[in-house]
Amino acid sequence: NVGLRGYGGNARSWMQLKPELPQMADEKGIIFVCPDGKNSWYWDSPENPAYRYETFVTSELVKYTDGNYATIPDRKARAISGLSMGGHGALWSAIRHKDVFGAAGSMSGGVDIRPFPQNWEMSKQLGEFAANKASWDAHTVVNQLDKIVNGDLALIIDCGEADFFLEVNKDLHNRLLARKIDHDFITRPGGHTGTYWNNSIDVSPGSVLLLSA
């Protein structure tokens, strides 16, 4: 399982959030890989050629992991999950590379970036919103759903009721329903916080770890 962290984090963010993750992974026989995606939003940036994080996550990282660890090198045994920016990245990566991943989970994911054009350095990767609306449209998760049909991916989406990303997650949920794509959609009390994400791993562990079990 690939675990993508949020904006401003680092490769140790998941371990700091949930120190029990290694034990949970051992109990389930899962390899949990936590890359550092900088503040890339896990795109191959059209503005910054040095930021090719979609390629890194979906190709280079997978090949390295399969080549150096005792994995099952099959999409059915591979999941990707993330929180916040990483939730966007997990869904973006899995939907666009369903040949690589069989499951994806998002916690508090920024699944539609367009309502937030001034935030989280996204303009460094896509250009300023006003002058690059087509690029922003093309780089948001909710506009990728034509790439999958029901059964392509196991999907779980989790977002707190006080989270500023709640409405875009509800929109994603409704779009998936309209396309008759099966998925789990979970909302609970809580915001865009470490406490919520820590509890999510216990309440809905499939969104992070056990989806691939």
Descriptions of predicted regions:
Residues 1-213:
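Non-catalytic cap/lid and distal C-terminal segments of serine-dependent acyl enzymes
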